[in-house]
């Protein structure tokens, strides 16, 4: 890939403040783009207003700026892209590739998250229903730049999946595929918790005629109880005054060498060195890293 053709992105959800796990993901994405003089875009995945936290959008932008992770172009907000999502849902539904589903959560208990196709041929009206995409009985596979080959049988391991919820909100799988294609994203660097989402996205890309980006899934930082760092587990928000030591810690989480002398450097100086020395092949080929190992 030539320097000018790389387009990466970071796409946080404004349901809370950025935490250390967010920093590791943002830093990996930023470095992978900047190391080849590529572009790095910022997209706010704000498709679920009930989960949004007041003030989180601005706080995320300010934190990234203070940590030196500057982006290219305007910030894209998924909440302003509903017309594009609606057009594709309509198209898929009218082509018979998607259908209305009125199954409740209670009805789906016991299926281990794999949709059994209860509404597949029922012909329900769209009003008040979720919209599911029909999946083929095929294996989708790709080679991740860190995790190696990954494959998933969509029919057996996932089942027909939701692209629009019953409340009218658009599902992550649909929005992320449409926005990555619209923005011309060539490389996706994100947490390994999304590894098993990727085959669904590959299918949507194929269905809609989009190019497949390269993927790099980094290990998640996990707490002693095995849960990933996240807003739902009250992970502490990033502190601006600790930017340099936290950047160095994030680099260690990504398997990168760090110089102790950089502890007295500015965030910009840390990033300048890290950008020159970026080695994605040094990232551990595993899906989790205990936070305690990074101290």
Curated annotation (Swiss-Prot):
A motif ('KMSKS' region) lies at residues 228-232. It comes from Pseudomonas putida (strain GB-1). The lineage of its organism: Bacteria, Pseudomonadati, Pseudomonadota, Gammaproteobacteria, Pseudomonadales. Zn(2+) binds at residues 101, 103, 115, 119. It is an enzyme of class 6 (ligase). Keywords: Aminoacyl-tRNA synthetase, ATP-binding, Ligase, Metal-binding, Nucleotide-binding, Zinc. One of its GO terms (molecular function) is zinc ion binding. Binds 1 zinc ion per subunit. One of its GO terms (cellular component) is cytosol. Belongs to the class-I aminoacyl-tRNA synthetase family. GluQ subfamily. This is Glutamyl-Q tRNA(Asp) synthetase. SUPFAM superfamilies: Nucleotidylyl transferase. One of its GO terms (biological process) is glutamyl-tRNA aminoacylation. Pfam families: tRNA-synt_1c.
